Swiss-Prot record:
It is found in: Cytoplasm. Participates actively in the response to hyperosmotic and heat shock by preventing the aggregation of stress-denatured proteins, in association with DnaK and GrpE. It is the nucleotide exchange factor for DnaK and may function as a thermosensor. Unfolded proteins bind initially to DnaJ; upon interaction with the DnaJ-bound protein, DnaK hydrolyzes its bound ATP, resulting in the formation of a stable complex. GrpE releases ADP from DnaK; ATP binding to DnaK triggers the release of the substrate protein, thus completing the reaction cycle. GO terms for molecular function: adenyl-nucleotide exchange factor activity; protein homodimerization activity; protein-folding chaperone binding; unfolded protein binding. This is Protein GrpE. CDD domains: GrpE. GO terms for cellular component: cytoplasm.
Length: 217
């Protein structure tokens, strides 16, 4: 810009030399106009230069802000992906457990008939102790009953062990009737029908008679 100003000034001097003798006032007016124009150009140039310098100073800050934003976005994206994957894993695990549970307890729907057969054999064995004619079949009944019991156990089915004198437990027992007994109140007097569990789930409550606890010996 300084070189341009110098060139214009030289031009002004040349013009002044050529026409100074004829029209000094006109030369002075032109000179003022040119000088004002040069001054305005110089101001604009300096302003643009200042703007450029300010922009250059801001570039590192903008670059840093851009890098920080990129890192933040990458971190947010990674966290979102991890959360989505964790949710998918949770759903898959839940579905897997539900499927395993369904398979585990699917046999429960088919157990009514085998359990009823076992009930009949247990009744027959109890009568065998009283009836000599039936007692001859005890060995055969016992073998069949044992075979059924082993098959049930192999499939996760176990008989709930209940003995007379035990406390009545509504979680595994169903009370058929309250009866007079020498046993304390709420004690099991007799088991009418055995209860069973499939793994840890009760699939049939034991039917029992429960003591009123009011009979004196």
């Amino acid at each position: 810009m300084c070189e341009k100003s110098q060139t214009i000034k030289e031009l002004l001097n040349a013009i002044r030399t050529l026409v100074v003798k004829n029209n000094k006032a006109k030369v002075s007016m032109i000179e003022k106009e040119l000088l004002a124009f040069v001054s305005e150009l110089d101001k604009k140039f300096k302003q643009q230069l200042n703007n450029f310098n300010e922009l250059q100073q801001k570039i590192p800050l903008l670059q840093k802000a851009n890098e920080e934003f990129a890192l933040k976005f990458e971190r947010m994206q990674r966290e979102a992906q991890n959360q989505i994957q964790a949710k998918l894993d949770e759903l898959n695990l839940k579905n897997k457990k539900e499927l395993e549970q369904a398979k585990k307890y699917a046999i429960a729907k088919t157990l009514d008939q085998p359990l009823n057969i076992i009930d009949q054999f247990e009744i027959a064995l109890s009568y065998a102790q009283k009836d000599p004619q039936v007692k001859n079949y005890t060995t055969g009944f016992t073998m069949v009953l044992d075979a059924f019991s082993r098959w049930l156990e192999a499939n996760g089915v176990t008989k709930i062990k209940i003995e007379p004198g035990m406390e009545f437990d509504e979680k595994i027992m169903s009370a058929l009737e309250l009866v007079d007994s020498n046993l304390a109140k709420n004690k099991v007097v007799r088991v009418s029908k055995s209860g069973y569990k499939l793994y840890d789930k009760v699939i049939r409550f034991a039917s029992v008679f429960v003591s009123k606890g009011n009979k004196k010996s």
